[in-house]
Amino acid sequence: MTGTILRFYVHENRTHRHVALFEWLLEQAKKLGIHGGSAFRAIAGFGRHGILHEEHFFELTADTAIEVEFVVTDEEAEKLLSLLRQERVSIFYARVPAEFGIVEGDL
């Protein structure tokens, strides 16, 4: 099957409608019928402003990046991007063509 890997990059402390943005993204994708998504926390990184963000042991609020990733059909990708535009969410994303499937085997 062919489709899209859709990745969003957000700061961990960013919210939308009083919910962490990465959690809101996962919930909205689920409501759209997308079959799965994952959120990954970065150890360290920098963005377009060149500021290094990294997690420290004693921080109460982290400012590191969260990557939210979906492997979807092109139609599902468009639905999710359209929703973000309607909600006026400003967010960086990467859209990569993908081939995906399931390898069946003995369990």
PLM ranges: what are they?
Residues 1-107:
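Positively charged, small/polar-rich N-terminal and surface patches that mediate targeting and assembly
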